[in-house]
Amino acid sequence: MSAPLSPSPTVVKLSPECQQYYQDVRIKNKYQGVVYKINKESNQMIIDKTFPNDCNFNELTQCFKENECCIIVFKYVISNSQSKLFFIYWGSETAPQTDKVLYSNAKLTLAITLKGIDIKIAGTKKSELTEEIFKERAIPKQA
């Protein structure tokens, strides 16, 4: 007898404001970034928080919490005239496996929906998402 099929991954819906807040970061420069979370009751991706335009990198790293997952769009400022838009998947290695699966599926949905992302990056440990790593990804190496 074969093993029962595991349930199919849950499809996470995007709340209407997900795209709007993304445009507020990317085009309107209203925020420097936005944190997306999944409301498990409604199974919907929602806005958890926004970053003001003058926030520093340390404020971003405070969102990388143990036992949690989230998705962040963050405008990393390289200089006064240059920035790169990062799509960040945070899935703490200590987060529940069900959350990791849920956010991994949501990551795919968001990545398809949000157009104009410069760089995608993922981490399970804070050491994988340091400012040095962001700089290396944002600034192309000179030949």
UniProtKB/Swiss-Prot annotation:
Q: Does the keyword Nucleus apply?
A: yes
Q: Which Cys-Cys disulfides exist here?
A: none
- The UniProt record lists the keyword Cytoplasm: yes
The record's family statement is: Belongs to the actin-binding proteins ADF family.
Q: What's the main place this protein lives?
A: nucleus
Q: Where is the ADF-H domain?
A: 10-139
Protein name in UniProt:
Cofilin-2
The cross-references to InterPro entries, in alphabetical order and at most eight, read: ADF-H, ADF-H/Gelsolin-like_dom_sf, ADF/Cofilin
What's in the keyword line of the UniProt record? Actin-binding, Cytoplasm, Cytoskeleton, Nucleus
Lineage, opening ranks = Eukaryota, Amoebozoa, Evosea, Eumycetozoa, Dictyostelia
A Gene Ontology biological process noted in the UniProt record is: actin filament severing
Q: What does this protein do?
A: Controls reversibly actin polymerization and depolymerization in a pH-sensitive manner. It has the ability to bind G- and F-actin in a 1:1 ratio of cofilin to actin. It is the major component of intranuclear and cytoplasmic actin rods. Cofilin-2 may play a distinct role from that of cofilin-1 in destabilization of the actin cytoskeleton during Dictyostelium development.
What are the GO MF terms of this UniProt record? actin filament binding
Q: Which domain of life is it from?
A: Eukaryota
The listed locations are: Nucleus matrix; Cytoplasm, Cytoskeleton
**Pfam families given for it?**
Cofilin_ADF (PF00241)
- GO cellular component assignments: actin cytoskeleton; cytoplasm; nuclear matrix
